[in-house]
Amino acid sequence: MKKLKETKISGISLPLYAFFVAVIIVVTLLGKLPLDMVGLTLLLVTLGHLLYFIGEKFPIMNSYLGGGSVFTLIGATLLSFFHIVPSNVIGAVSNFMGGKFGFLDFYIAALICGSILGMNRNLLVKASKKFIPIALITMVIGFFSVGLVGMLIGNGFADSVMYVSMPMMSGGMGAGITPLSQIYAAGLAHGNQAAIFSQLAPAVTFGNILAIIGALSIAKVFNKSKYNGHGTLVAATKEELAKPKIKLDAQQIGTGMLFAFALLMAGDILNKFFPNIHQYAFMIIIVFILKATNTVPKDLEESVVMFNQVIMTNLTHAVLAGIGLALIDLNTLASAFTWQFVVLCLTSVVVMGLASWFLARLFGLYPVETAIGAGMINNSMGGTGNIAVLSASDRMEMIAFAQMANRLCGAIVLIFGGILIRFFY
């Protein structure tokens, strides 16, 4: 009994946490759960922290299968698949995550700004010069590998690259295959955007699952090797790796939040004039330039880092729960499951992982981080997938590079998608 009282879930005592869970169950059964910011935040944060806690307690899950992060994703996905969570709540979570509410934008704004501004300037510039070329070369290698394997197994080069490789590298659902399906539909004589979207979605979903498994495996297998940078892409001095201790200040956290949101809006403004480039990509470029030129005052940098710490600590598990509940559709995945499809998806993930690993050694980067950041991330489903992949491999500090690779490669996929759909069909 004493041990139960001392048990804490994310710093919250077990009796108090049980009260939160009981309230959510009762209000959901009564059909009175508010499908707004209050109700959905309570649901996702409580569910996310609970599933993470359970996952961390399972020995095999904790040691070999990604622990709490992967368990949160799997657990939430199964709750949705078996209709344990009502469908109207799932729909509301979907809107909350990426629709009208933009909860993911809130989270990713904090993540990108905090990770870039909190990084050592020299380290950021040094790593970026080598990482971006590796991500692009890896993408080209992955594209042709999937096409060639497709030819060998009777799936054809065109169908393999256009319906497996391209969607896997497109950057997810919203910013990836939604515009890609529109581009395909416009390029085909009798193209139907909805039908094409349903053909592209399984590759994105399954590719994301394989990317999570791949990132987790790389991190585990090479944990104690010389190839592991422990979250850092390039070899660095102690001074470059040193993270200053920051004392949280309520007013500064508010300032950091406003600055992060303003930079996201600046990305929106640029996206208005260049709609083919995602707002996140513009945001990364802006923050990168500000950091590289030492434009942001130290106290403002610290404010953004504080905001990042608060959001990361309290909302990461909630985001993973939301991804599992609303964004991973096992029915869609099952409908496309053929052995050829599995082989092609595996080819993309394995080849891109190996290519980025060897390119990292050639360019002088840590292979573990590069294989995760350029290989696995380029097969994930965009912002949500990046979070899932990096969380599973305990590399969340790499979010800026992940978004950079994802958005850059995603934009290239959209451009070439419009050209190749007319060329092949």
Curated annotation (Swiss-Prot):
The keyword Transmembrane helix applies. One of its GO terms (cellular component) is plasma membrane. Keywords: Antiport, Cell membrane, Membrane, Symport, Transmembrane, Transmembrane helix, Transport. The keyword Cell membrane applies. It is found in: Cell membrane. It catalyses: (S)-lactate(in) + (S)-malate(out) = (S)-lactate(out) + (S)-malate(in); (R)-lactate(in) + (S)-malate(out) = (R)-lactate(out) + (S)-malate(in); glycolate(in) + (S)-malate(out) = glycolate(out) + (S)-malate(in). It comes from the Bacteria. The 46 C-terminal residues contain structural elements that interact with the R groups of the substrates. Interchanging the 46 C-terminal amino acid residues of CitP and MleP alters neither the specificity nor the affinity for the di- and tricarboxylates malate and citrate. In contrast, changes in substrate specificity are observed with monocarboxylates. This is Malate transporter MleP. It comes from Lactococcus lactis subsp. lactis (strain IL1403).
